[in-house]
From Swiss-Prot:
<dbReference type="GO" id="GO:0006974">
    <property type="term" value="P:DNA damage response"/>
</dbReference>
<feature type="binding site">
    <location>
        <begin position="15"/>
        <end position="23"/>
    </location>
    <ligand>
        <name>ATP</name>
    </ligand>
</feature>
<comment type="subunit">
    <text>Interacts with and phosphorylates clspn, an adapter protein that regulates the ATR-dependent phosphorylation of chek1. Interacts with apex2.L.</text>
</comment>
<dbReference type="GO" id="GO:0046602">
    <property type="term" value="P:regulation of mitotic centrosome separation"/>
</dbReference>
<dbReference type="GO" id="GO:0035556">
    <property type="term" value="P:intracellular signal transduction"/>
</dbReference>
<keyword id="KW-0723">Serine/threonine-protein kinase</keyword>
<comment type="similarity">
    <text>Belongs to the protein kinase superfamily. CAMK Ser/Thr protein kinase family. NIM1 subfamily.</text>
</comment>
<protein>
    <recommendedName>
        <fullName>Serine/threonine-protein kinase Chk1</fullName>
        <ecNumber>2.7.11.1</ecNumber>
    </recommendedName>
</protein>
<dbReference type="GO" id="GO:0005737">
    <property type="term" value="C:cytoplasm"/>
</dbReference>
<dbReference type="GO" id="GO:0045814">
    <property type="term" value="P:negative regulation of gene expression, epigenetic"/>
</dbReference>
<dbReference type="InterPro" id="IPR000719">
    <property type="entry name" value="Prot_kinase_dom"/>
</dbReference>
<dbReference type="InterPro" id="IPR034670">
    <property type="entry name" value="Chk1_catalytic_dom"/>
</dbReference>
<dbReference type="GO" id="GO:0000785">
    <property type="term" value="C:chromatin"/>
</dbReference>
<keyword id="KW-0963">Cytoplasm</keyword>
<keyword id="KW-0206">Cytoskeleton</keyword>
<keyword id="KW-0547">Nucleotide-binding</keyword>
<dbReference type="GO" id="GO:0035402">
    <property type="term" value="F:histone H3T11 kinase activity"/>
</dbReference>
Length: 474
């Protein structure tokens, strides 16, 4: 059964882990409303209390359709609880096909929503400083939501702007001035990161490891070698916008008002449109040039600031979907302000999903699916639970993964990706009536690398994979 949290609320599923704690899905037994609960252990690090206090203050300032909604917080002893929207659509990276990207029409839609959210943040003097696909969530209507304000800061107050000097973010997404300069303006840094996200959506890969002279791919970009990957996969109109967004000099970089006037940003792209451009120039070895998206690169050794370098070194906790209830409802008040939190945490809350009291109709698998985060990394098997489990373990062991049985029906897989970065993901075996579901969830590392590994495992297990489509639609 689900674990009681506050009166009428149960913790039913783990959504993600982070450096200081985890995010759980809380569901109201009476209304079936869902909220993401970020549970932070304040004793994990000396700077944790101050960082969480800052994150809460910034979240309180935010109110925009493209920003994950913050409902409130409460503290019990050394545990801090943050209550946020539950975004059932999952993370943006899950919509990006490795080395391919996504349809240009979809990329444009998500990019427009991203720019709307970033424009709002800048209008109230806040910079995010860690924009990447893993921090961009989707609700049930595919509305993009910017999440994770752990590295965000205020750069303008009462009309007075300050320069930033803190080296933070995720290396492939950071602007070059963060590496080169001791002080820099906030706005252009977020614009640069948005450009890298757009590149990932259109090409399914990142352009470089880091934006400096030691990276050949970045030097090629500055030399305008657009016949190389990933640029050769991007049509001329969006590439022209990227050239303006990924301009090395921040003073020459395009601003958000001008992005909104750009031809590609404003044009109506027909569904299914496939465009190509004539490419001239030399050839390249794509296996050498391919730069996968990853989010766990340590950039501390680049810091030249007196401020402590802030790293985004783990898979961000998924927050997340636009709530339909009144934010002043007694149910939310009870969750945020109520008494009697149960501190008995389940050993493996993911496995309690099917037995939770949140299910409105006993035995209804559809209600279960309505509470699952939308992901493409899951499949049904056509064998029983025991055979599914043994097949998974045998396959992953042969493929060289480090296996750890976390608890009943959950396995943690660890490996290194093609760039020698740590990759950890969990596999839950879920029994649904006469069906067995293998649900893969990224815990730490790069989203696209995780998807590559999932596809390889699925292919190896092809003999037991069912052709039945997994709900909800992906």
């Amino acid at each position: 059964m689900a674990v009681p949290f506050v009166e009428d609320w149960d913790l039913v599923q783990t959504l993600g882990e982070g450096a200081y704690g985890e995010v759980q899905l809380a569901v109201n037994r009476k209304t079936e409303e869902a909220v993401a609960v970020k549970i932070v252990d304040m004793t994990r690090a000396a700077d944790c209390p101050e960082n969480i206090k800052k994150e809460i203050c910034i979240n309180r300032m935010l109110s925009h359709t493209n920003i994950v909604r913050f409902y409130g917080h409460r503290r019990e002893g050394n545990i801090q609880y943050l209550f946020l929207e539950y975004c059932r659509g999952g993370e943006l990276f899950d919509r990006i096909e490795p080395d391919v990207g996504m349809p240009e029409q979809d990329a444009q839609k998500f990019f427009q929503q991203l720019i709307a959210g970033v424009e709002y943040l800048h209008s109230i003097g806040i910079t995010h400083r860690d924009i990447k696909p893993e921090n961009l969530l989707l609700d049930e209507r595919d509305q993009l939501k910017i999440s994770d304000f752990g590295l965000a800061t205020v750069f303008r107050h009462n009309g007075k702007e300050r320069l930033l000097n803190k080296m933070c973010g995720t290396l492939p997404y950071v602007a070059p001035e963060l590496i080169k300069s001791r002080a820099f303006h906030a706005d252009p840094v977020d614009v640069w990161s948005c450009g890298i996200v757009l590149t990932a959506m259109l090409a399914g890969e990142l352009p470089w490891d880091q934006p400096n002279e030691v990276c050949q791919e970045y030097c090629d970009w500055k030399e305008k070698n657009h016949y190389l990957t990933p640029w050769k996969k991007i049509s001329a109109t969006p590439l022209a916008l990227l050239c303006k967004m990924l301009t090395e000099n921040p003073q020459s970089r395009i601003t958000i008002p001008d992005i909104k006037k750009d031809r590609w940003f404003t044009e109506i792209i027909k569904k299914g449109l496939k465009r190509s451009r004539v490419i001239s120039g030399g050839s390249s070895d794509s296996s050498v040039l391919c730069k996968q998206i990853r989010s766990d690169i340590d950039i501390s050794h680049f810091s030249h600031s007196e401020e402590k370098t802030a790293l985004s070194s783990t898979q961000p906790e998924p927050r997340t979907a636009l709530a339909t209830w009144d934010s002043n409802s007694s149910y939310i008040d009870n969750l945020v302000q109520g008494k009697g939190i149960s501190f008995s945490q389940p050993a493996c809350p993911d496995n309690m999903l099917l037995n939770s009291q949140l299910i409105g109709t006993p035995g209804s698998s559809q209600n279960v699916w309505q509470r699952l985060v939308k992901r493409m990394t899951r499949f049904f098997t056509k064998v029983n639970a025991e055979s599914s489990y043994s097949n998974l373990m045998d396959t992953c062991e042969k493929m060289g993964y480090v296996l750890k049985k976390s608890c009943a029906n959950e396995v943690t897989l660890s490996t290194t990706d093609r760039r020698n970065n740590k990759l950890i993901f969990k596999v839950n075996l879920v029994e649904m009536e006469d069906r067995i579901l293998l649900d893969f969830r990224l815990s730490k590392g790069d989203g696209l690398e995780f998807k590559r590994h999932f596809l390889k495992i699925k292919k190896k297990m092809d003999a037991v994979v069912a052709v039945q489509k997994v709900l909800p639609d992906t």
